[in-house]
């Protein structure tokens, strides 16, 4: 269910197309190297040190079915063809190369070879300089600061990943998200029938401020038996960078107001995770209707806010924004 209308004004109140076009570049994911299944009895050659490069050994450790790196237990057929434990279950105990029965033979030699390897992070092309022992690399890659970001759009199961400039352009071009420049904002959310609340009626706006991008979320959902409205901000970057910023949200009317102040969450945290943690401005429906005039016929919420940067310890100019919440 969509909100009937949404108006937004910001400090500069201009679309940030030029800034985005300057930042945008094609985000190329690292494609996996496919090869024919030569990882047969060459395992013995690897174990005896006859293979010339680490790359050759790394190719032996690539599962011929899913092309992912193999981790113990590594299985092999009677002819020496190897595959990972996940794919063993998928191929119904038949070797995908020679079609012979797999059995329960482990390739201990290849597992031992893997222990001696040190390999770069798979996000090396994105800037990660780290090198890890083979069995430690996978754990690092799940939390690597250089790993791609997921699309922060909450209205669909979007599987797009990329760096921040790529995702900003993706949100604008593919999801038609509103883009604004400035560190203060003024939103008006209008809904004709406030009694109808489904999981989840929501809006998303992207702001460009201090050279960074922020996602402002506003949505209605059921919290227990009661419908609520929630607004929160996410920083398009890592958590350590997000801590450099603060934001405030204010909603009110008829002599009453609610104010929320906090640190934006990183888009590394999913939209649902932030929402379910209640880390934002939460407005109960009765209060929302009071702010709207109390006639309970139409929801009219005006949410204002600002983003500011903590002053630098080194004395550098923080460039704090002047609030404009009138």
Curated annotation (Swiss-Prot):
Taxonomic source organism = Arabidopsis thaliana (Mouse-ear cress)
Show the PROSITE patterns listed in the entry: ZF_RING_2, ZF_SIAH
Q: Which residues bind Zn(2+) 2?
A: 151, 158, 170, 175
Q: Which family does it belong to?
A: Belongs to the SINA (Seven in absentia) family.
Q: Where are the zinc fingers (SIAH-type)?
A: 116-176
Present the record's domain note.
The RING-type zinc finger domain is essential for ubiquitin ligase activity. The SBD domain (substrate-binding domain) mediates the homodimerization and the interaction with substrate proteins. It is related to the TRAF family.
Q: What is this protein called?
A: E3 ubiquitin-protein ligase SINAT3
One cellular-component annotation, GO? autophagosome
Question: Positions of the region Disordered?
Answer: 1-44
């Amino acid at each position: 269910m969509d909100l009937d209308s949404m108006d937004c004004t910001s400090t500069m109140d201009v679309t940030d197309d030029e800034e985005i076009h300057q930042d945008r570049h094609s985000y190329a994911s690292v494609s996996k190297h496919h090869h024919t299944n030569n990882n047969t009895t060459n395992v013995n050659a690897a174990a005896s040190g006859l293979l010339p490069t680490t790359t050759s050994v790394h190719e032996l450790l690539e599962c011929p079915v899913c092309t992912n790196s193999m981790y113990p237990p590594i299985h092999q057929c009677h002819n020496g063809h190897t595959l990972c434990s996940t794919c063993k279950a998928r191929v119904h105990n038949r070797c995908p190369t020679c079609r012979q029965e797999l059995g329960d033979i482990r390739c201990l030699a290849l597992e031992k070879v893997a222990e001696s390897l040190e390999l770069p992070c798979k996000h090396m092309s994105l800037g990660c300089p780290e090198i890890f022992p083979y069995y430690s690399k996978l754990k690092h890659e799940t939390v690597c600061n250089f790993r791609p970001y997921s699309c922060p759009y909450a209205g669909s199961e979007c599987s797009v990943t990329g760096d921040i400039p790529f995702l900003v352009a993706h949100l604008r071009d593919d999801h038609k998200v509103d883009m604004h420049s400035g560190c203060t904002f003024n939103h008006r959310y209008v809904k004709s029938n406030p009694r109808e609340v489904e999981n989840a009626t929501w809006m998303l706006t992207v702001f460009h401020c201090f050279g960074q991008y922020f996602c402002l979320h506003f949505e209605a959902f059921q919290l227990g038996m009661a419908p609520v409205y929630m607004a929160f901000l996410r920083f398009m970057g890592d958590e350590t960078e997000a801590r450099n910023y603060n934001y405030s949200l204010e909603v009110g009317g008829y002599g009453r107001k609610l104010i929320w102040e906090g640190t934006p969450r990183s888009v590394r945290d999913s939209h649902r995770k932030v929402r379910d943690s209640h880390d934002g401005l939460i407005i109960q429906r009765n209060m929302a209707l009071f702010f709207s005039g109390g006639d309970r016929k139409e929801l009219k919420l005006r949410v204002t806010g600002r983003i500011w940067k903590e002053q630098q310890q080194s004395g550098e100019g923080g460039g704090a924004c002047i609030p404009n919440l009138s």
